């Protein structure tokens, strides 16, 4: 591709509204442009990368025995009503009506549509197992789209769905898809980790996420230092306390704490150990009888919202109560809330259930109780695992301790069971002629998200460093002063032709531009292999080769360059 015929829309300055490196570099490299909040157009450079990832995903899906189809982005709402998700899904599901006042949704996922297709087309066990996939645009009306295509409202996704009459073939397909996802990420040249995961709003039993490892990742991965165990921190079980509750040694006293609205301030100003404090968090309840619920965790621990949402009394999706509701119910602000005397259901983390002589808000603004003890000062509360595990704690697998990594989720696979097939009466006749509800699997890959994740893992202060497999171009040709030197022009043109003939994708910078600009653009875009052509090199019978990832420079004889580049790309 000649740059003079290409839409090369690079920018020198970092856009002010781009928070993460991938968003900044995708804008600066001219890969995407924002049309509205969470909506982006893909320009030629970005689209080339996107299509390469899509091709690898498609190849691995086909190898795994999945069959490609294409379903509509616009879906009839009736199907979502059948599964109950039309109301449950929340505002992320964009609902609208056509001119005939019929209800539709813009698909964030396609379980309903695929189940509808299969229940109509498959009626015998002889047609199973069946694994179908598509690569299609999705839309989720995110309340706060962020980080460019990392969390956009419209995105490209590969979603596959498998159907089974028995658990054995379900497990076989799940394993095949697990391996396919490993193959995809390996071929993309990314460092990644598969982890056990929560099934979330889609539901089901077994689930794994695939994370590209990056310091900027939003997800925390907990893994054992001495085994293969790895899980999203949302899923990772915190260890049960090994110690027992100590006897009370002090009376409960009311203390003025006007300037202590956080645990850190309470500890600093009043000298109480943080392990002797608790945080009481008020969340929305699941019933009219208990519209608010209190969750209590130790002061140095973090609430795990996914675990908390699994409590029957807690509203799903999980949501904290607002200040007004808390004030109306308790008569105090959030900085002074505690479990003593609360007139609502109270659930505590296991670590809180063994505490004695601890401090908490007194449900009066500017006041705390110190020396609180269970049974004496407040009734025992139901205890659950409600916190995030901490680095260095024992691994749930029983081997080693937990270490933490940051990752970007790019893939998620589920065993759905009969959640959707039962709701939509997707049944087939088994070997005995009896009707049987289908088992389902669901397998998603964020194709557009992978572009951003790859950049988060592969960049430096000059720009993107693409793995060869997904680089927009494999080789860049930089001819110095080509418009003044016929020798440089002729040799550059011949090399361009030779590389094209060899099937190597080339970006040929034939602009009348300063060398510094040309070099900067090549590095920003992240072309893996760059060939510099100048009169001085030609005099020596050499090309100058530069590797984008290592920065290594080499002089390569003019007659050897094509074979050399083919070897680099192999």
Curated annotation (Swiss-Prot):
UniProt enzyme class: ligase
Residues that span the membrane, as ranges: none
InterPro entries: aa-tRNA-synt_IIb, aa-tRNA-synth_II, aa-tRNA-synth_II/BPL/LPL, Anticodon-bd, Anticodon-bd_dom_sf, Pro-tRNA-ligase_IIa, Pro-tRNA-synth_IIa_bac-type, Pro-tRNA-Synthase_IIa_type1
One GO CC term, this protein: cytosol
Catalytic activity, EC: 6.1.1.15
Family, similarity comment: Belongs to the class-II aminoacyl-tRNA synthetase family. ProS type 1 subfamily.
Protein name: Proline--tRNA ligase
Catalysis: reaction(s): tRNA(Pro) + L-proline + ATP = L-prolyl-tRNA(Pro) + AMP + diphosphate
Localization per record: Cytoplasm
Keywords carried by this UniProt record: Aminoacyl-tRNA synthetase, ATP-binding, Cytoplasm, Ligase, Nucleotide-binding, Protein biosynthesis
Keyword Secreted found: no
Function summary: Catalyzes the attachment of proline to tRNA(Pro) in a two-step reaction: proline is first activated by ATP to form Pro-AMP and then transferred to the acceptor end of tRNA(Pro). As ProRS can inadvertently accommodate and process non-cognate amino acids such as alanine and cysteine, to avoid such errors it has two additional distinct editing activities against alanine. One activity is designated as 'pretransfer' editing and involves the tRNA(Pro)-independent hydrolysis of activated Ala-AMP.
Gene: proS
Record comment regarding domains: Consists of three domains: the N-terminal catalytic domain, the editing domain and the C-terminal anticodon-binding domain.
Principal localisation: cytoplasm
